[in-house]
Amino acid sequence: MRIDVLSLFPDMFTPLKQSILGKAIDKGALDFHVTDFRDYTENKHNNVDDYPFGGGAGMLLMAQPIFDAMAAVEKAAGDKGHVVLLDPAGRKFDHHVAEELAQKSHLTFIAGHYEGYDERIRELVDDEISLGDYVLTGGELGAMVIIDATARFLPDVLGNQVSAEEDSFQDNLLEFPQYTRPADFRGRKVPDVLMSGNHAKIAEWRLKESLRRTWQRRPDLLENRVLTQTERDLLDDIKHE
């Protein structure tokens, strides 16, 4: 997958080139580029924003630098990709959106600043996404969150594909508790079933604990899940414990 970002602050994306994503970039599983759209301004002061027509508070991102930066991306990549605008008015980002975006071969993020965008910028956009009902100072943090979450679904990004498949929210359930050595840490013992070697019992315990954690912390997720009879029985047990 190729990922492009249009941003005024390219250095903010340096951390994405570390750790798991950095390794994915190094081995070619991810092709990552950041374009400073200030480089594409046509005015002598390199301004990328201006006052809104009709008055109002704040400044708006101008269309020209974004259009020209996008043209440069298209020239370099052969296409502009699936263009995502980070905007509070967009659809709310979640696990399923990340999985959907991971099916694209090329993503381009527009990370804006200021009060908002010149409406004509939206002509370039295929998707508008929001992280939630709050406002950030710019779109960079939102873009980084989406890129990180989306990249986890790409082949060869995670060392173990099962990790992505078993992560929280993969199946509208929160992840079950996990433990590593030692089996007894200062009197805090690992549940016996996890050391029993009985894979069927371990799977049942994990499912039950996923259901328990979801019911206790995010019951709304259960509303969007069609429970099997086994899951209904386990959930009934949990509620009556």
Curated annotation (Swiss-Prot):
Positions contributing to S-adenosyl-L-methionine binding: G112, L131, G132, D133, Y134, V135, L136
UniProt-annotated location(s): Cytoplasm
Catalytic activity: guanosine(37) in tRNA + S-adenosyl-L-methionine = N(1)-methylguanosine(37) in tRNA + S-adenosyl-L-homocysteine + H(+)
Presence of keyword Methyltransferase: yes
GO BP annotations listed: tRNA N1-guanine methylation
Function as written in the Swiss-Prot or TrEMBL entry: Specifically methylates guanosine-37 in various tRNAs.
Family membership noted in the UniProt record: Belongs to the RNA methyltransferase TrmD family.
Protein name, entry field: tRNA (guanine-N(1)-)-methyltransferase
Protein source organism: Leuconostoc citreum (strain KM20)
